[in-house]
Amino acid sequence: MKQAILYVGHGSRVKKAQQEAAAFLEGCKAHISVPVQEISFLELQEPTIETGFEACVKQGATHIAVVPLLLLTAAHAKHDIPEEIVRVASRYPSVRISYGKPIGIDEEVVKAVYHRMKDIGVPYENARVVLIGRGSSDPDVKRDVTGIANLLQEMVPVKEVIPCFLTACGPNYKEVFSELEKDDGITTFIVPYLLFTGMLMNEIEREVQKLKAHNPNVYLSSYIGFHPHVKNAFLNRVRETAANSEGQFDFDGGSYASAAH
């Protein structure tokens, strides 16, 4: 058996985000002792999943571990990536495939959130944290972001952690911001739970500037991005998918739900 890893990033229109994702994935390769490792993206960016998968096969891979670089569990992880794998893999029926989980709820990413807060240089004890996720109609997204918020509350001595979302589920972050316009004297950290920069981050920056006109005790952190703790969490996902010790990551050509995720 010849093992391969196929990393699957989301892809972006923004050049800086493209470069950050590609550099991050290239940097992961040195930490994984697998002979064949290829990078791909779901959309908006080359190489495609098809190109990456075929590159693995051409190098003799008989088992490909497909690992999505996604913070949250939603449609991309459950449907879009699996559907593309099914389409491409149908040409290579002898290749065994395992399929990994998104990062999800993980102490390592909670540490990344904490460090983004700490980087601001303002005392965080008894502060309020507003954690902004992308949002989705998929309930697992709300579950993931809420779970991360709860873990942060347990691990860091803050007053409260409020999970909210940019779109598609509630509470919407603008609703939370409107409640923060009245300065109650509590330091508030706004933490964008996003992997890369782009239109969503720009939108948050604009809204925080408006909020600060009413409440100067509001501080915006950097987006989570590819922090070393995010890297740790992702590498754990890569290793468990490649090992697939109990077959729990087997991909049988069905939907995401067909695997024991």
Curated annotation (Swiss-Prot):
One of its GO terms (biological process) is siroheme biosynthetic process. The keyword Lyase applies. The keyword Hydrolase does not apply. One of its GO terms (molecular function) is metal ion binding. InterPro entries: CbiX-like (IPR002762), Sirohydro_Cobaltochel/CbiX (IPR050963). Induction: Up-regulated by sulfur starvation and repressed by cysteine. Also induced by O-acetyl-L-serine (OAS), a direct precursor of cysteine, maybe via inactivation of a putative transcriptional repressor of the cysH operon whose activity is controlled by the intracellular levels of OAS. Pathway: Porphyrin-containing compound metabolism; siroheme biosynthesis; siroheme from sirohydrochlorin: step 1/1. Signal peptide: none annotated. Fe cation binds at H10, H76. It holds the Pfam family CbiX. Its EC number is 4.99.1.4. It catalyses: siroheme + 2 H(+) = sirohydrochlorin + Fe(2+). Keywords: Iron, Lyase, Metal-binding, Porphyrin biosynthesis. PANTHER family: SIROHYDROCHLORIN FERROCHELATASE, CHLOROPLASTIC. Chelates iron to the siroheme precursor. Belongs to the CbiX family. SirB subfamily. This is Sirohydrochlorin ferrochelatase. It comes from Bacillus subtilis (strain 168).
